[in-house]
């Protein structure tokens, strides 16, 4: 009975978080500024309009050039987190925000580096004055190139480098071999074996890191961290635990696949969750497990936090976050989606990205622009729709919170 009550309590907790963050209306009210509405003004970004008191309002910085990243908001900043995408409850006053940006000097190096048994695909960058090393772990059936070839993970790398972190990326041994060695049907990291020698993935990472130490590209004296998505999220918890890293951030992962790590870790662990995660092992039950695991870690006196990324409206310029789609083209795609009835009245997308592609396939005449996109551009649209619908995918909406956790897991 106690267990049932505990689960119900967590369901209510998550539900209350969702309801508290769900806007009554993201769509600006008609001009004329009724008595129960006030104005939001956004410079260098999106979200300007009149909103009713009590609405949850989303704002976004403008798209970044390849050599820049979002830095901070000026204005009524007590209302928001300092993220490129932030939201707040509309107060009974006019508010204004202006986005500022930071130039990033960065160039990722790729090479094949000998690990324990095989040459591994490795991407890395060691900025001057680095304050720490961050390892990035792809999800099941992913690869090292996932982090550099997709916009959202690429945005994370820029944020890390801009804030002084070195980055090391490689891939699971099963991916290198293109062989499902344990027969679980996926190409994955070994996340349930907390052994630095017998876990092939951990042995590989140690060998690669030692290579960089021996080249004098970095120092053994700076702290280390890791970030992973899905299976990579579980692996990040296990890796941090095995090598006693300062902290780890697990995206779209509950930690149950990380062996005994949740019960033994001395590393700070942050769980980064999606509100409507559509992976079979996550969803509401997975989010509850992650929250329970975070609490369990805290109960042992180790710092742990979690957050839930909530669904957000689609705005016309959204797809231009990736420069392979212009703002004009993004606006045309948005209009086709809107005209096809795929958006709610508050501009939230109905369902997941597959709804768009099913509609395009069944009625291509309604999507003359979207149906003509290249495969790369289609993938960009899918990636951004996954972000706003909080599907099972990495998202950069909380990069600042993750780096804040790394800087001080007990903040």
Regions found by a protein language model. Name each.
Residues 182-216:
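Alpha/beta-hydrolase active-site loop
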Residues 299-411:
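C-terminal catalytic histidine-bearing segment of alpha/beta-hydrolase fold enzymes
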Residues 56-84:
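Surface-exposed interfaces of beta-sheet-rich extracellular modules
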Residues 246-337:
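The feature captures the conserved acid-bearing segment of alpha/beta-hydrolase catalytic domains
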Residues 15-41, 102-103:
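Bacterial Sec-dependent N-terminal signal peptides
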Residues 102-129:
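N-terminal cap/lid segment of alpha/beta-hydrolase-fold proteins
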Residues 218-266:
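Primarily recognizes the serine-hydrolase "nucleophile elbow" in alpha/beta-hydrolase
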Residues 131-139:
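Short beta-strand element of the alpha/beta-hydrolase
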């Amino acid at each position: 009975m106690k267990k049932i009550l505990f689960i119900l309590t967590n369901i209510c907790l998550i539900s209350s978080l969702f309801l508290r963050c769900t806007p009554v209306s993201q769509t600006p009210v008609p001009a004329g500024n009724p008595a129960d509405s006030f104005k939001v003004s956004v410079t260098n970004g999106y979200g300007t309009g009149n909103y009713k008191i009590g609405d949850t309002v989303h704002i976004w910085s403008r798209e970044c050039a390849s050599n820049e990243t979002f830095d901070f908001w000026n204005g009524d900043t007590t209302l928001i987190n300092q993220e490129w995408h932030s939201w707040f409850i509309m107060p009974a006053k006019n508010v204004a925000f202006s986005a500022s940006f930071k130039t990033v000097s960065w160039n990722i190096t790729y090479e094949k580096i000998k690990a324990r048994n095989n040459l591994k695909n490795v991407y890395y960058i060691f900025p001057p004055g680095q304050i720490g090393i961050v390892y990035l772990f792809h999800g099941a059936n992913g690869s090292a190139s996932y982090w550099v070839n997709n916009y959202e993970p690429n945005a994370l790398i820029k944020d890390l480098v801009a804030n002084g972190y070195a980055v090391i990326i490689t891939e699971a041994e099963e991916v290198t071999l293109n062989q499902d060695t344990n027969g679980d049907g996926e190409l994955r990291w070994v996340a349930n074996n907390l052994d630095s020698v017998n876990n092939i993935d951990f042995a590989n990472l140690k060998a690669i890191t030692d290579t960089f130490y021996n080249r004098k590209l970095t120092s053994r004296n700076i702290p280390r961290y890791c970030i992973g998505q899905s299976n990579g999220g579980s692996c990040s918890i296990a890796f941090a635990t095995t090598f006693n890293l300062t902290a780890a951030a697990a995206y779209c992962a509950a930690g149950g696949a990380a062996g005994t790590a949740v019960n033994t870790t001395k590393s700070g662990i942050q769980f980064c969750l999606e509100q409507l995660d559509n992976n079979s092992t996550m969803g509401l039950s997975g989010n509850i497990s992650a929250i329970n695991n975070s609490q369990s870690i805290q109960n042992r006196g180790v710092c742990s936090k979690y957050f839930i990324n909530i669904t957000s409206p689609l705005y016309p310029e959204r797809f231009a976050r990736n420069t392979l789609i212009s703002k004009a083209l993004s606006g045309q795609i948005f209009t086709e989606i809107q005209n096809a009835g795929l958006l709610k009245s508050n501009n939230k997308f109905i369902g997941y990205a597959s709804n768009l592609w099913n509609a395009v396939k069944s009625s291509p005449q309604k999507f003359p622009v979207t149906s003509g996109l290249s495969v790369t551009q289609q993938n960009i649209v899918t990636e951004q729709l996954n972000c706003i619908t909080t599907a099972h995918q990495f998202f950069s909406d909380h990069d600042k919170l993750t780096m804040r956790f790394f800087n001080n897991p007990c903040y």
